[in-house]
C-alpha cells in the first residue's frame, strides 16, 4: 500500500481519538526500516504526554486499524511523544515555539551550510525567520526547508 494513503487513513482514524483526549497530533509516519514497517504516531499536550496517554491512544487506534484493516503489510504501531527535538510542521508551531533555539535543515546549502541553528523568531508569509549568532536575522522560504526542529542543548 502506498505510504501516503496509509498516512491519510491513519490520520483520519486517529484524529477523533486524540481530539477526544485534547491531545495534539504532532506527526505521523509510515516507513520501512530494514525489513520491518513502522506506523509511528507522535502526540503531545500542554504539560507533556505520559506513557498512559500513549498507551490509551495506541489501544484505541489499534482497534480502529484492526476494524478497517487498511494496511496489508505486517507493521509495528508506535505511539509516543515527539521528544525534546520535536519537529515543527504546522504554522502554529512556529508561533508557539518563537524564542526557542531550532535546527533547520535545508534541501540546498546556504553559504556552504545545509544545517542552520538559531533562535526562532517566527513564520511570516511562508518565510521561517531565525536569528543566527554572528549572522543576524535569516528569512528562509519554507519550501526550501527540509526539516525544522527544536534543538537539544545539554
From Swiss-Prot:
Chief location category: cytoplasm
Keywords per UniProt: Cytoplasm, Ribosome biogenesis
InterPro entries, sorted: Ribosome_maturation_RimP, RimP_C, RimP_C_sf, RimP_N, RimP_N_sf
Protein's UniProt keywords contain Metal-binding: no
Cellular-component GO terms for this entry: cytosol
Signal peptide extent: none
Location(s) in or outside the cell: Cytoplasm
This protein's record includes keyword Cytoplasm: yes
GO biological process, one term: translation
SUPFAM superfamilies in alphabetical order: YhbC-like, C-terminal domain (SSF74942), YhbC-like, N-terminal domain (SSF75420)
Role of this protein: Required for maturation of 30S ribosomal subunits.
HAMAP family: RimP (MF_01077)
PANTHER family: RIBOSOME MATURATION FACTOR RIMP
Family stated for the protein in its record: Belongs to the RimP family.
Protein name, per record: Ribosome maturation factor RimP
Gene that encodes it: rimP
